[in-house]
Swiss-Prot record:
Gene3D superfamilies: Anticodon-binding domain (3.40.50.800), Bira Bifunctional Protein, Domain 2 (3.30.930.10). GO terms for molecular function: ATP binding; histidine-tRNA ligase activity. It comes from Coxiella burnetii (strain RSA 493 / Nine Mile phase I). This is Histidine--tRNA ligase. Belongs to the class-II aminoacyl-tRNA synthetase family. The gene is hisS. It is found in: Cytoplasm.
């Protein structure tokens, strides 16, 4: 027997019963971002490897260990995008979107990272990305956070996701803090785990994000970034917190919060849940004013966020009822009337265009069809058999309430269904 081919590890299929949750989520994303007049942008899933090395940082885990990189037939090094911001900035520069313009953009699509797969973390994963360009200051950051909260409310998830904030300050203040942190950690290097020792010489801020419980006492005594902020950075962060307080958006200031990408400055934030174990971050973002210039564009203030759709779907499944709604399941009694049943079902769709109607064209027994009708979650079963064809009637059975079934003429069926909703 030929061995079957399996999906690549960490790249899963999305099956039909899961799609309604994805559709609900994607539609909510589009609705919320459009309400703020953000415009969609699309860019390739494959970019030059140099793009990510320059923006994400050579010493990050993403570039060192997680990127899907290959050499094409021309000898060029290409990479499947591990995140969307770098590609969005590249597209903006190449197409002149940032030249003396304010841009509010969004995108939705797959990203790729070679990580160890587990619940909520995959090698192909989908993100909603929201990016703003040309606006400095805290107000646009507050708008991004308001947008996130509005999305959680639209999804019914606001009670299980909370906001954490921090500031990385300007590059100058962050560099001063980085030196103080390195000096402190070097004095206690023997207490660091292997991964943190490596990061000490490459990306020391990431040590603050360690989940190793043995390191937490050491990190609690580490220098605090807030003590190294310049006055500009302090005012920026104070203004953001004031705006959130005025809008009654609850938040926690988390001084150990850093992002895994080198290009962040000033504000960083994460929306976190305690319902997904170790993969608790469902959305993350902040400000990255130096990124456009880093890629060869004109100095442009920028801020944005990315939300992980797989993790949001996991949360949705816990709070939303089945989203695969069927209004009518048409039971066709006997192979002799399948054609009549099919044509009548199509007529129903013409007059009830908003209703979801499924016709059983299997020709199987009534018992089997009613089992499928009940399992489908449909509200009504509409029975069409030889007797109904002869008398120009249908039999209507309510599948969710214990009420007598009804025999209706075709003329009275539509008004009755509309009245019952």
């Amino acid at each position: 027997m030929t061995k079957s081919i399996q999906a690549i590890r960490g790249m899963s299929d999305t099956l039909p019963e899961e799609i309604p949750y994805w559709s609900f989520l994607e539609n909510a994303c589009r609705s919320v971002v459009s309400a703020y007049h953000y415009r969609e942008i699309r860019f390739p899933v494959v970019e030059q490897t140099a793009l990510f090395k320059r923006t994400i940082g050579e010493a990050t885990d993403i570039v060192e260990k997680e990127m899907y990189t290959f050499t094409d037939r021309n000898g060029d090094s290409l990479t499947l995008r591990p995140e969307g911001t770098a590609g969005c900035v590249r597209a903006g520069i190449q197409n002149g979107l940032f030249y003396n313009q304010i841009q509010r953009l969004w995108y939705l699509g797959p990203m790729f990272r070679h990580e160890r797969p587990q619940k909520g973390r995959y090698r192909q994963f989908y993100q909603l990305g929201v990016e703003t360009y040309g606006m400095a200051g805290a107000p646009i950051e507050a708008e991004l956070i308001f947008m996130c909260l509005r999305l959680w409310k639209a999804l019914g998830l606001e009670s299980c996701i909370h906001l954490e904030l921090n500031t990385l300050g300007t590059l100058d203040s962050r560099n001063a803090y980085r030196q103080a942190l390195v000096t402190y950690l070097q004095s206690r290097e023997k207490e660091l785990d292997e991964d943190s020792r490596r990061r000490l010489h490459t990306n020391p801020l990431r040590i603050l994000d360690s989940k190793n419980p043995d390191l937490q006492p050491l990190l609690a005594e580490a220098p605090k970034l807030i003590d190294y902020l310049d006055e500009t950075s302090r005012r920026h962060f104070d203004q953001l917190r004031s705006l959130l307080d005025q809008a009654e958006v609850p938040f926690i200031v988390n001084p150990t919060l850093v992002r895994g990408l080198d290009y962040y400055t000033h504000t960083v934030f994460e929306w976190v849940t305690d319902q997904l174990g170790a993969q608790g971050t469902v959305c993350a973002g902040g400000r990255y004013d130096n990124l456009v210039e880093l890629l060869g564009g004109k100095s442009t203030p920028a801020a944005g966020f990315a939300a992980g759709l797989e993790r949001l779907v996991l949360l949705l499944r816990g709070v939303q009822e089945c989203l695969d709604k069927i209004d009518i399941y048409v039971v066709i009694a006997g192979e002799a009337v399948i054609q009549e049943g099919l044509l009548m079902t199509e007529q129903l769709r013409n007059v009830l265009p908003e209703w979801v109607i499924e016709a059983d064209l299997s020709g199987s027994s009534l018992k089997s069809q009613f089992k499928r009708a009940d399992k489908s979650g449909a509200k009504w079963a509409l029975v069409i058999g030889e007797e109904e064809i002869k008398t120009n009637t249908v039999t209507l059975k309510h599948l969710r309430e214990t009420v007598p079934q009804k025999s209706l003429t075709r003329d009275t069926l539509i008004p009755y269904l509309k009245s019952e909703g």
